[in-house]
């Protein structure tokens, strides 16, 4: 996104501990602005999901949690409060439509519980209970498909029509006259 004021950290990888587990995130851009840390994640999809759907995404929850815990390494402010962290999704198909998702202490605590429960569920599961999907169409786009002997590299997501999400979860309110051309 153009005209961002503050210190910029592009392609930044941060990690933090959650219990006995390490969480890692690679951010498109972290912007340090005054006392705040702002995540920018750009998406190239043609359809823009609803804000509620973005808020519930694992990516949103994980990125904000990790930045809250590890973001002090980017500033001289000391420990970060969740209210100092926000995440912005920027859709290249509609550059003026930035979706901003602020964070809160209440949501932060819910996210910690959510990821602790996922980690425990993984630990509790026996190896034979990690099953492969029967839907081979999903495998075509999975970056881990080689681990299951279902191909070597994932397919192009631009050709994938559905992520199992209802169409009404997406908004497509574009005015093509307002969209600037992107230079390469």
Question: Model regions: which residues?
Answer:
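Acidic, low-complexity intrinsically disordered tails
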Residues: 156-184
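Cys/His-rich metal-chelating microdomains
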Residues: 145, 151
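A non-catalytic, helix-rich entry segment at domain boundaries
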Residues: 1-10
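Mg2+/Mn2+-dependent nuclease catalytic core
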Residues: 12-117
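Polybasic (Lys/Arg-rich)
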Residues: 106-143
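Basic, low-complexity terminal or inter-domain segments flanking catalytic cores
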Residues: 126-132, 152-155, 160
């Amino acid at each position: 996104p153009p005209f961002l004021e503050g210190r910029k950290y592009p392609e930044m990888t941060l990690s933090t501990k959650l219990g006995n587990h390490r969480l890692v995130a690679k951010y498109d851009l972290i912007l340090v602005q005054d006392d705040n840390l702002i995540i920018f994640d750009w998406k190239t999809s043609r359809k823009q999901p609803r804000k509620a759907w973005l808020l519930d995404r694992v990516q949103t929850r994980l990125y904000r949690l990790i930045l809250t815990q590890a973001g002090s390494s980017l500033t001289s402010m000391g420990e970060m409060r969740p209210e100092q962290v926000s995440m912005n999704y920027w859709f290249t198909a509609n550059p003026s439509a930035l979706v901003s998702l602020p964070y809160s202490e209440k949501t932060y605590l819910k996210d910690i519980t959510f990821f602790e429960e996922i980690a425990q569920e993984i630990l509790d599961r026996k190896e034979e209970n990690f099953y492969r999907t029967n839907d081979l169409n999903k495998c075509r786009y999975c970056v881990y498909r080689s681990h299951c002997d279902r191909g070597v590299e994932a397919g192009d997501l631009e050709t994938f029509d559905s992520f199992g999400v209802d169409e009404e979860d997406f908004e497509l309110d574009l005015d093509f006259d307002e969209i600037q051309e992107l230079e390469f």
